[in-house]
Design a protein with these regions (language model features):
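A short hydrophobic beta-strand segment most commonly corresponding to one strand
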Residues: 50-52, 65-84, 141-146, 191-193, ...
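Short acidic-glycine-tyrosine-enriched beta hairpin
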Residues: 38-56, 178-198
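Short, conserved beta-strand element in jelly-roll/cupin
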Residues: 3-6, 17-34, 147-151, 159-177, ...
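A short, N-terminal "cap"/entry segment at the start of jelly-roll beta-barrel domains
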Residues: 1, 7, 80-150, 223-225
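Residue-level recognition of conserved beta-strand positions in structured domain cores
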Residues: 2, 36-38, 63, 72, ...
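A structural signal for the main folded, soluble domain(s) of proteins
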Residues: 2-5, 11, 16, 28-31, ...
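Short histidine-centered beta-strand/loop micro-motifs
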Residues: 12-19, 36, 43, 62-63, ...
Length: 225
């Protein structure tokens, strides 16, 4: 989901949680303040920052800026949200290493990744660089999230074997070429999914290109094709 709220201010939220296998909150524009179970006081998520909300972690949204925009990815997309009438946030405990089990018994840690602290490295696709959000490690490879920018070199045709491969265009433009498909010129606000083993190429990327890539699983193979 791409969520946009034009008028900010205090949010009349209650302590709640989601019965979900994986959930990402990426701040695209503006900022939002949130309380999380066992993570201390209010945390402000700025543009370029992200959270993952482990399964059933209690949380409450406090306040948001005008024009806040967030990208929310939940798996499954349709899931149950429940109110916790007994818990008060913040909790007295600070447990940054706590793990919340998913339906498969794998523990997931809360992640607050700050964009301004990013270190950029070569991406899995030639011609691009990426910042790893540590979500692959925190979820034991349930999911991976990277922010991608234009690097050096010419983009090449490649394919992947991830079960789910979703990308949101945050800034800039490029042409998405797919095997057996017409090319699409994509711009900020567009999104796409690439099926496993489909040959694609990100051609003619603008210098200001920035992509949000979300994959399940977090660890997968990419083959130049």
């Amino acid at each position: 989901s791409h969520i946009r709220i034009p008028d900010g201010g205090p949010v009349p939220d209650m302590v709640h949680y989601h019965r979900v296998g994986f959930q990402l909150i990426y701040c695209y524009r503006g900022w939002v303040d949130v309380l999380y179970e066992d993570q201390g006081g209010p945390i402000r998520l700025h543009a370029g920052d992200c959270f993952i909300q482990p399964p059933e972690i209690r949380h409450r949204v406090l306040e948001a800026s005008d024009g806040i925009e967030v990208i929310e990815i939940g798996v499954p997309a349709e899931h149950v949200t429940e109110i916790d009438h007994d818990m008060t946030l913040p909790t007295s405990d600070l447990r940054p290493d706590r793990e919340w089990p998913d339906s498969q018994g794998r523990g997931q840690r809360f992640v607050h990744n700050v964009g301004s602290d990013a270190q950029w490295h070569p991406f899995r696709l030639q011609g691009f660089i990426a910042r790893d959000t540590t979500i692959n490690d925190a979820t034991k490879s349930v999911a991976g999230v990277q922010v991608v920018r234009r690097g050096t070199g010419d983009p090449q045709w490649a394919k992947h074997d991830a079960d789910i491969h979703f990308t949101f265009v945050m800034e800039g433009t490029f042409t998405l070429e797919g095997e057996g498909k017409d090319p699409f010129r994509l711009t900020a606000g567009d999104a796409f999914v690439i099926p496993p083993n489909m040959r694609t190429r990100y051609s003619e990327p603008s210098d200001d290109l920035e992509l949000l890539e979300v994959t399940l699983a977090g660890t997968f193979s990419t083959t130049v094709a």
